C-alpha cells in the first residue's frame, strides 16, 4: 500500500516539466483565476447563507490542504520526510492558520479584513512569481499540485470574501495591513532564529535577487507585500466603481 501511494505522489511519473511562465504555469493560473471569477459571478445573486457556506468550504480547504500536507509529505519523493520549512513562519503558511480563526470565530472580526487582503496579496505574489519553486518538476506531481492548489484556495477565499461583500475595504485603514506585515516579519525572524537550518522564512535572511544585498531584504519584503496590498485595494475600488456604473454587484 505504501508503495502505491509513494508512486501516486512521485515526481517520477511524468517526463513533463513545469517552469516559470511556461504553458503549465499559465495553465494553473488560468484554472485558479478562472475558477475564482466563475464562483464570484455564479453566486453573486445567491442568498447570504449560500455565500457564507461557500466561504466556509474554502476556509476548510485552505486549512485542510495545509495540515494534510504534513501527513502526505512522507509519502512523496518530493520530500525526505516532513519538511519543517512548511511550519507557519512564511506569510502564506501563517495565513493558513489565521483563515479559520477569522472565518469561524467572531472574536477575530477586527483583523478579518487584514487577513483577507494579506491572503490575496501573498498568494498572488507566489502564484505569479514562484521562482525556484518550479524547479523542473512534473506539472502534476504532488509538490506542484499541492502548492498551487493551496495558494489557489487561499486566493479564492480572499477574493470571494470581497466579492460577496463579507467585508468592505477602506483605504484609510490600510495601515492595519502594514502592521500585520511587520508582525509577520518579527514572527519570521523568530522562526529563522530558532531553526538554524537556512530556511529563510519570509525571505528576510538571504536575498533571492542577485542585485539586492541580504541586509536590505527585510525592508524590501515589507515594501513589496505592502505594495501588492495597495494593488488589491486599487483593484477593489476599480471593480466596485465599474460594478456601480454597469452591473449590480456586492463589491
Regions found by a protein language model. Give the residues of each.
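Alpha-helical transmembrane segments in multipass membrane proteins, preferentially the mid-helix core
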Residues: 37-42, 98-100, 153-172
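Aromatic-anchored segments of alpha-helical transmembrane domains
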Residues: 62-71, 119-131, 181-192
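Non-cytosolic membrane-interface motifs at loop->transmembrane helix junctions
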Residues: 78-91, 136-147
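Membrane-interface helix-boundary motifs at transmembrane edges
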Residues: 43-56, 104-112, 163-175
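Membrane-embedded alpha-helical segments of multi-pass membrane proteins
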Residues: 26-35, 88-98, 115, 128, ...
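Membrane-interface transmembrane-helix boundary segments in multi-pass integral membrane proteins
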Residues: 13-31, 176-183, 193-233
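Membrane-proximal helix-loop-helix units in multi-pass membrane proteins
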Residues: 101-162
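N-terminal topogenic module of multi-pass integral membrane proteins
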Residues: 1-53
Amino acid at each position: 500500500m505504501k508503495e502505491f501511494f509513494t508512486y501516486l505522489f512521485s515526481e517520477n511519473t511524468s517526463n513533463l516539466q513545469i517552469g516559470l511562465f511556461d504553458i503549465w504555469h499559465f495553465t494553473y493560473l488560468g484554472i485558479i483565476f478562472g475558477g475564482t471569477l466563475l464562483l464570484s459571478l455564479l453566486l453573486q445573486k445567491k442568498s447570504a447563507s449560500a455565500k457564507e457556506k461557500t466561504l466556509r468550504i474554502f476556509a476548510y480547504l485552505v486549512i485542510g490542504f495545509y495540515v494534510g500536507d504534513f501527513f502526505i509529505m512522507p509519502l512523496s519523493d518530493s520530500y525526505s520526510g516532513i519538511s519543517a520549512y512548511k511550519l507557519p513562519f512564511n506569510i502564506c503558511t501563517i495565513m493558513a492558520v489565521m483563515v479559520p480563526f477569522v472565518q469561524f470565530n467572531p472574536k477575530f472580526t477586527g483583523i478579518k479584513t487584514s487577513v483577507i487582503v494579506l491572503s490575496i496579496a501573498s498568494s498572488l505574489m507566489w502564484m505569479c512569481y514562484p521562482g525556484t519553486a518550479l524547479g523542473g518538476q512534473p506539472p502534476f506531481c504532488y509538490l506542484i499540485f499541492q502548492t498551487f492548489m493551496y495558494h489557489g484556495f487561499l486566493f479564492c477565499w480572499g477574493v470571494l470574501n470581497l466579492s460577496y461583500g463579507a467585508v468592505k475595504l477602506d483605504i484609510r485603514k490600510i495601515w492595519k495591513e502594514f502592521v500585520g506585515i511587520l508582525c509577520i516579519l518579527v514572527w519570521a525572524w523568530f522562526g529563522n532564529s530558532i531553526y538554524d537550518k537556512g530556511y529563510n522564512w519570509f525571505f528576510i535572511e538571504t536575498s533571492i535577487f542577485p542585485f539586492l544585498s541580504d541586509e536590505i531584504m527585510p525592508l524590501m519584503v515589507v515594501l513589496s507585500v505592502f505594495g501588492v496590498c495597495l494593488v488589491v485595494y486599487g483593484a477593489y475600488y476599480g471593480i466596485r466603481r465599474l460594478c456601480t456604473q454597469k452591473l449590480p454587484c456586492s463589491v
